[in-house]
Amino acid sequence: MPERIEWLEDGTPYSPRFGDRYRSESGGLDQAREVFLKGCGLPAAWAGQPQWCVLETGFGLGLNFLVTWQAWKTDPLRPRLLHFVSTEAFPASAADVLRSVQVHPELLPLARQLHDQLWGLLPGFHRLVFEEGRVMLTLCIGDAKAMLREQSFEADSVYLDGFNPGLKPADSPDIWDLHTFKAVARCCRRGTRVATWTVARSVRDALAQCGFVVKKTPGIPPKRDNLQGEFNPAWEPKKSMLPGIRRQAGSCVVIGAGLAGAAVAASLARRGWRVVVLDAADAPARGASGLPAGVLAPHVSPDDSLLSRLSRSGVRATLQQAHALLDAGTDWNPTGVLEHCVDHARKLPAAWQSDWAEAAQDWTCLATSGQLAHCRLPASAPALWHVRAGWIKPASLVQAWLTTPGVEFHDHASVGQLIRQPDSWQVLDANGHVLACAELVVLAAGYASRALAEAAVPPTSPPLALQAIRGQVSWALHPPGAADALPAFPVNGHGSLIPALPLSGNANELAWVTGSTFERDNALNDLKPEDDSHNLDRLRTLLPDVAPGLTGQLEMGQVKAWAGVRCATPSRLPALGPLAAPNLWVCSGMGSRGLTFAALCAELLAARLHAEPLPLEQRLAEALRPQYGEAKLVSED
């Protein structure tokens, strides 16, 4: 459940858990500006910088974030990117966050945007994106110490906020103790500024032990003092604790113009890179990303597995991009998705039905009898309802990403060889003609990435563990009366059905799409009539009372097909990371979840290149490292 907040007669939010106000008696806005922003030398300190990272312990009601965002927005010398990383063990509801800002009307436009993204805050990291990707809030839900151990970046400013250190309940984590400050120090560079409102001796001593040099400064009446300082340890931090070096934006060649490649190109271009995207086809999204439409929905498992957690981060990232770039109803539709658990009943994690029930219901819950009836399924059918889900046309998302300023697309550019120069790469075609040169190359060409990587890395390096998987979907225009006979939302679980896909931007010309087949070790995209029969057979299992109204179209020759070749890894997780050659990366292996993972992987790649805060926990990010050897797929469940 969201943290319970009581509202005092003067409108001040109060925490029953901590027995303390969320704001200082002098006013939260003054404290945010004077104690934290000014205490860290902002906005002057970030002038002219490519990026700036603020770390906060204690998100509370988000006021410090909103004030920092406002300062960035109104500063002509602002950095290109503002990262704000905040930990919070007891997240408040979106409604309370918005209510708390009513007394500060100048912040309301920003607060409404924040409110709209404050959903589904289960334990872990949540990347919220504003200002077309230039302001990024990474909310880390959980104990500050544990959350910061999952991060890897250098903060430029640190806000130490929270309730009075003397009021901590016995069952709550302590964000003012030595171990928390050690975790904070691990995320600091020499010279990182720190600010807080408390001058408690225990806090000053703990900060000093962790390498912070602090001093008292005049406070806001009635408070006499605040605390300011900087990270300047008398020792050199261990190299193993240091994140990567913040590199400057440069030139990049991305090979492959599908979801993975276009997402990488857009993420790098937003950071100032000059990106050339090469593809052998005559247009973008001619490979697996040319699918007429795909279902976007999270994976669910009773133990909240690695794949489940990664899929939620990916779905959130894709939804943000779709809302910003695509036309709802034409390019995509967030209708929600019903998962009919045909093969076995999927159980929700136990915590989703108790402590985190409200946040979990923003993601997935048991399907209602009404939703089942809409699919002509019995009320006893095992099914889930994915709230933040729907269908997307992958090609539309690819096209939108490739229009990002700084991205240049070249078609008919078949890459034959990569040649390493002293400080760059030459990308050549099969005849040895130079297609492009850049300091960084990202392989995002699906299964073809394996051969390109093998030719570019030292011969002793093992091959990438990538497997080609052919898939075919079947589709047809709606027969008469189909609108009333079909569900209003996609259904998945044993194959899938997208019931109402507008074609060519015409909302009145609708088609249904079902599939897909799954043929391993086949890199050919030829169409097979027997695959259409297979897809319709699976649809009979998925939706027994809906399928008969569509299968007749197969007999009348009205069903059409599309086939493509996906690329997967043994773990069924994407392959993202550097290869055994300088400035050569791979972003591939997303299987049937390109829509889920492309945007997330692109942001993770950019974060690693620029030593930015990670968009997901370190242990999840590490699971995406490229795998090598033979590609033998494992089960998802």
UniProtKB/Swiss-Prot annotation:
It is found in: Cytoplasm. Its cofactor is FAD. Residues 1-232 are annotated as: tRNA (mnm(5)s(2)U34)-methyltransferase. Its EC number is 2.1.1.61, 1.5.-.-. One of its GO terms (molecular function) is tRNA (5-methylaminomethyl-2-thiouridylate)(34)-methyltransferase activity. GO terms for cellular component: cytoplasm. In the N-terminal section; belongs to the methyltransferase superfamily. tRNA (mnm(5)s(2)U34)-methyltransferase family. In the C-terminal section; belongs to the DAO family. This is tRNA 5-methylaminomethyl-2-thiouridine biosynthesis bifunctional protein MnmC. It comes from Polaromonas sp. (strain JS666 / ATCC BAA-500). The lineage of its organism: Bacteria, Pseudomonadati, Pseudomonadota, Betaproteobacteria, Burkholderiales.
